[in-house]
């Protein structure tokens, strides 16, 4: 903004705050816009991009200072700018709220900057998403999944807690197994991205269930090999992800190379992988960038697990009161722990 008219116009259209860029405003212009905003009970985000502007913001008494990570000359971004400037703001204006702006796309970036900033201004990366609610969850909490959903009420509990994905287990021997109709009813409980869990199923059966229910991903929990995965890929609707689960005992398993969107590592106890309630040695994870972490996750260890940098956590038995019965208090506690950074 460069003119007080814009402030009044913004308020007319329902804005609660304005962003004032010290890179384009001198002190006199800033004060005029500040006065107009305050007369309308509007907040002000004062944007700085270098040390000089930072000192001006402090001298002007800015209460909320945004650090723009974008170079306005060539439009490149550098998140280290927040790390470089925030300590000076803390020193000179300890009561100011620090906001990191621009170039923020992932939850890991948010976690990395959390010790420097009190909040984040995120625009294009969120607005490009079809589902804004789930997009915000992904960047603030990570792409976490609550598996073993068997009832619409449990889907609602998972969604309310902060989950992005909901897991539906189509494995008959599982204590949390669902059939097609119960899966459909469960999905009616909340607008999660639903993942179907299968184990050595016929490819055509998997594709049929996925297509009919509109699932977002397939999680393979059996001995499915690369040939199986390649065939399944050709049968699934475009955009449906394939996740491969691996049991981890005392060594990291070999991961399939092609057509896998996410690798899920779960604790293996004897011949059983998944649903054991056990935690494996997390030092075996390796590169976490494509990993969903499962196995014995609960409110007690969710915060520590979230620090590992995985794509997301897969919660199940640790947030239940009984197999297939999700506990609202445990879910809320687990996601509070994840959010504690």
Language-model features, listed with the residues they occupy:
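Active-site beta-loop-alpha junctions enriched in small/polar residues
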Residues: 1, 23, 49-51, 70-72, ...
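N-terminal active-site wall of soluble small-molecule enzyme domains
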Residues: 1-45, 53, 82-85, 167-235
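Catalytic cores of alpha/beta
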Residues: 2-13, 49-60, 100-122, 150-161, ...
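Ordered, small/hydrophobic-rich secondary-structure cores
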Residues: 4, 21, 29-128, 281, ...
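Glycine-rich phosphate-binding active-site loops on the catalytic face of alpha/beta enzymes
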Residues: 6-29, 66-76, 116-139, 163-175, ...
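Hydrophobic faces of well-ordered beta-strands that scaffold small-molecule active sites
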Residues: 18-20, 44-46, 65-67, 98-101, ...
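Glycine/Thr-rich beta-alpha phosphate-binding loop at enzyme active sites
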Residues: 57-90, 167-174, 248, 258-292, ...
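C-terminal helical cap(s) of enzyme catalytic domains, especially alpha/beta-barrels
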Residues: 79-88, 114, 126-147, 180-189, ...
């Amino acid at each position: 903004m460069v003119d007080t008219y814009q402030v009044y116009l913004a308020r007319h259209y329902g804005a609660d705050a304005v962003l004032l860029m010290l890179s384009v405003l001198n002190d006199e212009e800033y004060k005029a816009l500040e006065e107009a905003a305050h007369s309308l009970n509007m907040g002000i985000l004062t944007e700085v991009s270098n040390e000089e502007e930072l000192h001006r913001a402090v001298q002007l008494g800015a209460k909320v200072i945004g650090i723009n990570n974008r170079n306005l000359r060539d439009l490149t971004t550098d998140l280290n700018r927040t790390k470089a400037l925030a300590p000076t703001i803390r020193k000179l204006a300890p009561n100011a709220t620090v906001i990191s702006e621009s170039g923020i796309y992932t939850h890991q970036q948010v976690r990395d900057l959390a010790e420097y900033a009190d909040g984040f201004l995120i625009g294009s990366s969120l607005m490009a998403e079809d589902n804004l609610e789930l997009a915000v969850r992904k960047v603030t909490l990570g792409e976490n999944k609550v598996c073993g959903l068997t009832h619409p009420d449990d889907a609602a509990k998972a969604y309310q807690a902060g989950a992005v994905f909901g897991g539906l287990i189509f494995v008959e021997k599982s204590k949390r197994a669902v059939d097609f109709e119960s899966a459909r009813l469960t999905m009616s409980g909340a607008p999660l991205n639903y993942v179907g869990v299968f184990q050595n199923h016929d490819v055509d059966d998997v594709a049929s269930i996925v297509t009919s229910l509109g699932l977002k991903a397939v999680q393979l929990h059996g001995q499915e090999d690369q040939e199986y995965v390649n065939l399944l890929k050709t049968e699934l609707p475009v955009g449906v992800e394939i996740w491969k689960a691996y049991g981890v005992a005392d060594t990291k398993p070999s991961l399939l190379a092609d057509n896998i969107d996410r690798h899920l590592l779960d604790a293996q106890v004897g011949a059983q992988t998944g649903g054991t309630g056990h935690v494996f040695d997390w030092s075996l994870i390796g590169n976490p960038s494509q990993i969903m972490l499962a196995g014995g996750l609960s409110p007690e260890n969710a915060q520590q697990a979230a620090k590992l940098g995985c794509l997301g956590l897969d919660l199940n038995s640790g947030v239940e009161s009984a197999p297939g019965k999700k506990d609202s208090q445990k879910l809320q506690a687990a996601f509070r722990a994840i959010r504690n950074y």
